[in-house]
Swiss-Prot record:
NCBIfam families: PRK00029.1. Keywords: ATP-binding, Magnesium, Manganese, Metal-binding, Nucleotide-binding, Nucleotidyltransferase, Transferase. Pfam families: SelO. It catalyses: L-seryl-[protein] + ATP = 3-O-(5'-adenylyl)-L-seryl-[protein] + diphosphate; L-threonyl-[protein] + ATP = 3-O-(5'-adenylyl)-L-threonyl-[protein] + diphosphate; L-tyrosyl-[protein] + ATP = O-(5'-adenylyl)-L-tyrosyl-[protein] + diphosphate; L-histidyl-[protein] + UTP = N(tele)-(5'-uridylyl)-L-histidyl-[protein] + diphosphate. One of its GO terms (molecular function) is magnesium ion binding. It comes from Shewanella loihica (strain ATCC BAA-1088 / PV-4). Its EC number is 2.7.7.-, 2.7.7.108. The active site is at D244 (proton acceptor). Belongs to the SELO family. ATP binds at G81, G83, R84, K103, D115, G116, R166, R173, D254. It is an enzyme of class 2 (transferase). InterPro entries: SelO. This is Protein nucleotidyltransferase YdiU.
Length: 484
């Protein structure tokens, strides 16, 4: 790996330099060739294993933990920071630079009484979801590898330590700006320094003045809205949408007790530390705006309040428009003239009517949408109908749907497009859990097979049909722990 160190060199005081605590007897548990290509790596070898396990220095790496704060479940935590993640620097790849971070590489000044370790369970889940979201065409950080060991660590029970090697275009979070606004170490000059760095690295086309700052914040609002529209369309619940888990690039970031919906439930909670459902699936769009408002508050010293408010007021428009594009594609309906608020509202009612039916009839989210790839849209007798208990409700909806759809001239082509936007396979929690159990028993083959499956989520893969089934009784509606 060839590194540059722009964050380390240009933002002194925004991090602490640290030394990794290596993993004894490390072993490769998972490796993403896709992600490796981003930074010019090919096959994993023992030298790389020892380096990424924190056991020997990698030439050119700097090893630092970033400081930030954030709002967690609505309350402000004045200092958080990388408590177990160590960034090596920005690695050069064929099409740009990627931060390389070792998540679980030991204690830092920000560990807050933690041990700085990650357990194998959480490392495997982060690896799988990072790569799954990417192949679902959803903006996300990437995962290069999982490195396991036999080092015991204690959470609710004894587990083994592991490292996820994360790649990110940036690790700058909403919480970075909050820290340098609200903390004693912060100042207007440091906020401006951080924002100027962000623009120079990721938005070089924008000027480093008020006009550029406003344009940047508008971009962050739009990108965040579009990301959450993707989550809602595919049925992904992040689970811990704290502001320190929000990327300024609009990437999915910092995965814990996430879930893809099995049965469609608007109020589904995937995190057992969230009994009130602050981060329930259906709450995510509103939380996205709330988090942007917290970011805006932190930017008041350097961006005019009126401009921040004006940008925030565009969030709902960006969210709805992005959601409509995705859901029209899933349903196979075209945007017809006249476009505008009346047409959008009618389509939102059509989409909402279908999701309400799915919820009332306890249907599987992924499998139900996938059925549109086999649907004859011109037939009065929908193959979907048999899935519903409320036949009258479905018939009413389907009639409205066909009227909106119109006659389809190329049915096979229409179905093929639906198959490319309605995935057959998603990372169901029970599938991840089965792979984790196998890893605990020393068998990484199920993890490798699941990873490969998730790189082709839209393909039929008939030999993998079992992965598309609804979860067994033990795996239904799994609620995951924040402990990792």
């Amino acid at each position: 790996m060839k590194f540059k160190q722009d964050y380390f060199d240009q933002l002194s005081g925004f991090y602490s330099q640290v030394t990794p605590q290596g993993l004894p007897r490390p072993q490769w548990l998972a490796w993403s060739e896709d992600a490796a290509a981003l930074i010019g790596l090919k096959q994993p070898d023992d030298e790389l294993l020892q380096g990424l396990a924190g056991n020997q220095a990698i030439p050119g790496a700097s090893y630092y933990a970033q400081v930030y704060s954030g709002h967690q479940f609505g309350g402000y935590s004045p200092q958080l920071g990388d408590g177990r993640s160590i960034i090596l620097g920005e690695a050069e790849g064929p099409q740009g630079y990627w931060d390389v971070a070792l998540k679980g590489a030991g204690m830092t000044p920000y560990s807050r009484h933690g041990d700085g370790r990650a357990v194998m369970r959480s490392a495997v889940r982060e690896f799988l979801v990072s790569e799954a979201l990417h192949h679902l065409n959803i903006p996300t950080t990437r995962a290069l590898a999982v490195i396991g060991s036999d080092l015991p660590v204690w959470r609710e029970t004894q587990e083994t330590a592991a490292i996820t090697v994360r790649l990110a275009k940036s690790h700058i979070r909403f919480g970075h700006f909050e820290f340098f606004c609200h903390s004693e170490q912060g100042s207007k000059d440091k906020l401006k320094q951080l924002l100027d760095f962000t623009l120079s690295q990721h938005y070089p086309e924008l000027s480093r003045d008020q006009a550029g700052y406003i344009a940047w914040f508008n971009r962050v609002v739009a990108d965040t809205a579009k990301l959450i529209a993707h989550w809602q369309a595919v049925g992904f619940a992040h689970g811990v949408m704290n502001t320190d888990n929000m990327s300024i690039l609009g990437d999915s970031f910092d995965f814990g007790p996430f879930a893809f919906l099995d049965t469609f439930e608007e109020d589904f909670i995937c995190n057992h530390s969230d009994p009130n459902g602050r981060y329930a699936f259906g709450q995510q769009p509103g939380v996205g705006l709330w988090n942007l408002q917290r970011l805006a508050q932190a930017l008041v010293p350097i961006i005019a309040s009126d401009d921040l408010i004006a940008a925030l007021n565009t969030y709902q428009h960006h969210l709805v428009q992005a959601y409509l594009v995705l859901m029209r594609d899933k349903l196979g309906i075209k945007l017809v003239e006249p476009a505008g608020s009346e047409r959008d509202e009618a389509d939102l009612q059509l989409i909402g009517g279908f999701t309400l039916l799915m919820e009332a009839n306890r249907l599987d989210h992924t499998n139900t949408w996938r059925r549109f790839a086999q649907l004859d849209p011109n037939s009065q007798h929908s193959s979907l109908r048999d899935d519903f208990i409320d036949l009258a409700g479905f018939d009413t909806w389907y009639q409205a749907y066909q009227e909106r759809l119109g006659q389809v001239s190329d049915v096979a082509g229409w179905q093929a497009v639906r198959a490319q936007v309605n995935p057959k396979y998603v990372l169901r929690n029970y599938l991840a859990q089965e792979a984790i159990i196998a890893c605990e028993e020393g068998n990484t083959q199920p993890l490798a097979e699941l990873h490969q499956l998730l790189t082709r989520p839209f393909d039929e893969q008939p030999e993998k049909e079992a992965y598309a089934k609804r979860p067994p009784e033990w795996g239904q509606g799994l609620i995951m722990s924040c402990s990792s």
